[in-house]
Amino acid sequence: MPRRKQEQPKRLPSHVSRQEEAEGELSEGEHWYGNSSETPSEASFGEVQENYKLSLEDRIQEQSTSPDTSLGSTTPSSHTLELVALDGEVLRDSLQCQDHLSPGVSSLCDDDPGSNKPLSSNLRRLLEAGSLKLDAVATANGRVESPVNVGSNLSFSPPSHHAQQLSVLARKLAEKQEQNDQYTPSNRFIWNQGKWLPNSTTTCSLSPDSAILKLKAAANAVLQDKSLTRTEETMRFESFSSPFSSQSASSTLAALSKKVSERSLTPGQEHPPPASSFLSLAPMTSSAALLKEVAARAAGSLLAEKSSLLPEDPLPPPPSEKKPEKVSPPPPPPPPPPPPPPPQSLELLLLPVPKGRVSKPSNSASEEESGKPFQCPICGLVIKRKSYWKRHMVIHTGLKSHQCPLCPFRCARKDNLKSHMKVHQHQDRGETFQCQLCPFTSSRHFSLKLHMRCHQHFLRTEAKVKEEIPDPDVKGSPHLSDSACLGQQREGGGTELVGTMMTSNTPERTSQGGAGVSPLLVKEEPKEDNGLPTSFTLNTADRPANHTKLKDPSEYVANSASALFSQDISVKMASDFLMKLSAANQKEPMNLNFKVKEEPKEGESLSTTLPRSSYVFSPESEVSTPGVSEDALKPQEGKGNVLRRDVSVKAASELLMKLSAESYKETQMVKIKEEPMEVDIQDSHVSISPSRNVGYSTLIGREKTEPLQKMPEGRVPPERNLFSQDISVKMASELLFQLSEKVSKEHNHTKENTIRTTTSPFFSEDTFRQSPFTSNSKELLPSESVLHGRISAPETEKIVLEAGNGLPSWKFNDQLFPCDVCGKVFGRQQTLSRHLSLHTEERKYKCHLCPYAAKCRANLNQHLTVHSVKLVSTDTEDIVSAVTSEGSDGKKHPYYYSCHVCGFETELNVQFVSHMSLHVDKEQWMFSICCTACDFVTMEEAEIKTHIGTKHTGEDRKTPSESNSPSSSSLSALSDSANSKDDSDGSQKNKGGNNLLVVSVMPGSQPSLNSEEKPEKGFECVFCNFVCKTKNMFERHLQIHLITRMFECDVCHKFMKTPEQLLEHKKCHTVPTGGLNSGQW
């Protein structure tokens, strides 16, 4: 049998001796296992000896038990069986191994599935036995095929981090091979017939594990180099030949890993091996340059794809079994790329990671998808991406690492800084964003967007407004913004828009309907109303005449639209403004009786038709109400042109009607009036102008059969351009007085319905007539809260409209006082007078301690806090006491508290503790407790009580004697001159109504009413109400008022004590805020 094997054609002749084989064994041990000794490692040598002792019968049995043989043969070949009994020495002479991986293909080897040997031995036997069988059969057939076909037909799965590791390993191996004499032969082991046989090869020999790694590296390198054409590969591989057919290298890896996993999971079961091919481990070339080139190509592909995100290998199904194909000269068509092997099988083929190294996945997605998210150690928030985690940690650290180079602005995020830098860009270009409806200007477009929300009730097509749906929780009001309503009537042109706005069954449905409504569309809601109060309607249903019960205030929610007037006029003034607008919108006198709708009647129906600028509200009954067809709700084209003339005034009227809900709120859980009251028409033939049917909860519901009467020809419509021009809300005085004249001309009011009017001092009597809605403050409710627009529950029920004129006799003061300069409206004449002083250039309120001058008294009061004094007006009172302390009841305290920092003194412990909290920490201990009977001073309250109990028991408080300590002559002179001046001018100060009295802001100080009390109380400051007991303390206090140098801001004329404070203060004027210019409002 050995003779017959020798007669076989030798494919790879050997030219080395047995001694070189032993050296090759040593080289294998040194290169792969890292042994530095000259003897082979014990593991490799023992394994070789064990494989040599394998019996011939066992090997024959292993080869014959496989159901398939190499190259698709179903029965074992006789030549294959004879190969098992071949002697080891003959095999060493007939085989050789080269340093490069052959790209040739052989079928999957036969192996015993039931073998219980270690996984490494089975894997080597699986690889090498199959390659030898294919070599023998293919050589017998005599068919040779160029390996370029393999390279051209290979198709691989996408590269993973495993493939990248293999490519790096292949590159390292190639570099070592070149260093160890690339073209000189050396010894290594090869696997044959179940034994490891040393043979001649290069110095860099391959073990089965290294062969697997190189196989994977070569396969992935070919995959990554997709840009190479077939001709280039032909030139590269044309000098090599292979007798095997071409298949996919990835299919090889899939089959190999599946085989290994089956052997490792179920070693006792037999599994028919798939017939798919895998790359042969038989070396076919003697050049290490090709391996180096493949590794270099793989490294170049990795660098090219470094920036792209590499997907992780998916879990594929096991490779499908297909019939083996015989080797033929023409290359078969390239098969579809098979799925890559499972990750668990692929892990078996990987080289173990050396100690000290950690293999990290190359793509960021693999780390995020591997179930290892980032968790915040402070709040426990789990974040998927590391960049998001870093940005989240700024919340806890508070680190603002981004600094604006032009101003002190700092932020934590780069995008916020980028948005901030746009402000400086607009400032450098001189760009500002101007509101088209008011004088508002801003350097940021976003600030203009926020500002435009104020004008959403006066929406214009040319103004870019960020439209928002109003609060849908206001019950009884439409779920459509008035900006959308006006936007439709302006953008529509000749088109006519109409919608049916009905209240929903539940508050939940109401909120959903309001949230889903587009700003320019009308949403139809259910027609039943089972729980919500209906809107403001005009009904002809028969009801009790004296039905005046108000709605429960808990059913209403505060309207956010009142913020429009929050900076300009109060809500009460907005309500007064509303009443004049509503009166002007009346097309003809009507006999109305306003009542509060308590519960709608059955059979009450919707209004019939609407112009294009209006919407219908359907106050349905709480039980059931028949629906209304859409034909009855279509607009009338003939009435649309009438409303185009005064639609702006109606919009303002409806807005202010909504704002009037705020004017009746009671803060202390008292029933309030938040919505307009119901209107009941006594005469059913009275028709209402279409202009009343606008926008909010003031829409009037009428019967279907009621005809829509045209506007009288002799009636002058309201001003059309009243709100069409770009004016601010603060210029409402023009509208107010024009409408007041129209109201007074059109309606004749009796003295019972007219309340005495307080006219504005800035308008003549003939131009400004008395308004029927005005009232005197003396006729208001007795409670003082009514003066501020608050009405108690018993009085709110008395608010009704007088029948006969259709105008209400409201029980609160609604006279408005506008400013001629800026148009701002005030509710009191005193407030207007104080406001007018801001428009004058004269600064008549001057500080007597420094050069500061203010336009109004409030600003001077605020400024005087720097000097620890307060300015008090004596316009209406002869004597004003600025401070009324609890200790001013005449009680005599045995001791008092004195502050060493500012000289403040008080006898009450609570006031003194409150005062000392104003100082910094190091100054809070600079105080003393002084005895009123003597000069005893201490810092402990227990000591002063002991002192009083032992020394001054039963004694009355005495006037403290003057101290003998030296004093400053300048302070004494100032005190004497000030005291003498105050004695001479004391009576004049009390007589003059417009003079100023300077008193102390300290709550514990005793007020000084006249100059005669000073000798009894000791030393009293002429600049403030400070009184002290000793002269040295009085002189120390005077130093506060003798500040010779104050640092004044040249922009706002504010004084600072130190130049550092002034420098810090000036930064407020240099940093742009993007807000409203103070001079315009």
Swiss-Prot record:
Comp. bias intervals (Pro residues): 327-344
GO biological process, alphabetically ordered: chromatin remodeling; establishment of protein localization to telomere; negative regulation of DNA-templated transcription; negative regulation of shelterin complex assembly; positive regulation of transcription by RNA polymerase II; telomere maintenance
Database matches in Pfam families: zf-C2H2
Lineage: Eukaryota, Metazoa, Chordata, Craniata, Vertebrata
Chain positions covered by the region annotation Mediates direct interaction with RBBP4: 1-14
Zinc finger (C2H2-type): 374-396, 402-424, 433-455, 817-839, 845-867, 897-919, 929-952, 1019-1041, 1047-1069
Organism in which the protein naturally occurs: Macaca fascicularis (Crab-eating macaque)
Record's function text: As part of a ribonucleoprotein complex composed at least of HNRNPK, HNRNPL and the circular RNA circZNF827 that nucleates the complex on chromatin, may negatively regulate the transcription of genes involved in neuronal differentiation. Could also recruit the nucleosome remodeling and histone deacetylase/NuRD complex to telomeric regions of chromosomes to regulate chromatin remodeling as part of telomere maintenance.
Name the UniProt record assigns to this protein: Zinc finger protein 827
